[in-house]
Amino acid sequence: MCAVSLTKPVAVVALGGALGASARFLLAELWPGIWTVLLINVVGSLLLGYLAETVGPDRLSRLFLGVGVLGGFTTFSTFAVDAVREDAVTATLYVVATLIPALLAARLGMLAGHRHRLARKAVA
């Protein structure tokens, strides 16, 4: 892929990333702490699961919403650093309390998105 054909996708991801990261920053400023990061990652997993099932093949929409907005909103690296900084019990609880709900949320989002897609097809 040449540089010219990357210009629009990079701009779309950058714009989405700025929006998602700004939303995460605002939430973390309003409610600082590891549990806000947990909530952000679980909600982001739910939304990405839904997105995976509902956004059509339009590459720019997927890049903007998935890689950009939700990629900027969620944060695995902050989750990892926060876990390492905690004592062993809190870190273990935090890891389990993040990963299991995030996986379940992603699946729930995918199921909801699948049902939404089927309902749209039935109407069309």
Curated annotation (Swiss-Prot):
Function noted in UniProt: Fluoride-specific ion channel. Important for reducing fluoride concentration in the cell, thus reducing its toxicity.
Principal subcellular localization: membrane
Name under which the protein is recorded: Fluoride-specific ion channel FluC 1
Binding sites annotated in the UniProt record for Na(+): 71, 74
A GO cellular component annotation in the UniProt record: plasma membrane
Topology term for the membrane: Multi-pass membrane protein
Pfam families recorded: CRCB
Subcellular location: Cell membrane
Keyword annotations: Cell membrane, Ion channel, Ion transport, Membrane, Metal-binding, Sodium, Transmembrane, Transmembrane helix, Transport
A biological process from GO: cellular detoxification of fluoride
